[in-house]
């Protein structure tokens, strides 16, 4: 091996080491090949829980949940409860050591058998936009809505059907109106 070849190998090794360290600082101290799913800090702070995180906790390779200490406990508490139910360890890490907007990850102890290309979850709001549903559908999470709009949710976004309830006859008697109908003029 010539001196030039040796220097190239040293440079490649150095680049790999630097990339690995940069990767770990982005993913809360973990290598990307161990990450099953990731949420941004903004997503963790939303009122709704992400189904993808709950499903990732059920993955046989999932061993722990790591979250940024910058996230208020009131927002991370529900994920901690789900992790405990799934018998997944959890820990918080100090945000000073890491850069980027990663707020929560579900990881394996080893590299995943089937690597995930994009570990980041699409925001719920963006999912509604992709289905061409008005943002009032998203804003009406955990509210009672009319039968028509509940049917739309069941057809277009079945994974979120349990986030809504149907307005009952009694609710209508007391003047309750569907927030989606009010916004869209239905």
Regions found by a protein language model. Name each.
Residues 58-65:
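Short, surface-exposed connector motifs at secondary-structure boundaries
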Residues 82-134:
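Short basic, glycine-rich beta-strand/loop surfaces that mediate nucleic-acid
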Residues 23, 48-53, 75:
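Well-ordered alpha-helical segments embedded in enzymatic catalytic cores
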Residues 1-47:
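Short, compositionally biased "basic patch" segments
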Residues 3-4, 16, 115-148:
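Ser/Thr/Gly-rich flexible loops in soluble cytosolic domains mediating phosphotransfer, phosphorylation
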Residues 69-75:
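Acidic, metal-coordinating catalytic cores used for nucleic-acid/nucleotide bond scission
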Residues 137-186:
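Charge-patterned, long linear interaction tracts outside catalytic cores
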Residues 58, 77-80, 84:
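Anion (oxyanion) recognition and catalysis
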